[in-house]
Amino acid sequence: TRFDVGIAVYSHNQLYGKWYFRKAGNYPKTGRSLRMELRGEKRSALLYSASEIEILRPEEEPDHPYLGKLGPDAVDPDVTRAEVLAQLEDPRFRGRNLGALLLDQSFVSGLGNYLRSEILWWAGLHPSWRPKELDDEDREDLARWILDVTRQSYETGGITDCLERVEDAKGRGVPF
């Protein structure tokens, strides 16, 4: 997370780190360990149970052992389909099966298991297939789905289905 004051906070939350956003001074009742608090006049961001936290200056990020290896961030609006397509065609990645590749944060960062499954479903691709086995159209479609599914999920709090279908289902009383 980058801040306007010229620093970034790197935290590795594993599966158990958790952020809470609350009124300043209002701490949740939890058995977790408070690892970091960012406190303003009215609100606080509290990070519990993270395994690693570092404060970095922007010039330190490229040399960080984890951050320096990350691929393009799928949520970043400045990342283009062409960049993702270039990753799919890169010799480091084109021979790897899609199931493993989509979890490799050096390929494209920000994807996890459920996004991998959704991306492959929407693209109509099998997880054992490799980018070099796909035709140009399938690779271009995959690059599009990587960005579209990830960004929609981020913007909607996790919805990866067709938004029109979701709205129709909600209108019929289907719980979401």
Cite the ranges covered by each PLM segment.
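Phosphate/anion-contacting hairpin/loop surfaces
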Residues: 9-110, 115-122, 130
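Glycine-rich loop at the start of a catalytic domain that most often binds anionic cofactors/ligands
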Residues: 2-7
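Basic, nucleic-acid-binding surfaces and adjacent catalytic neighborhoods in DNA/RNA-processing proteins
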Residues: 87-176
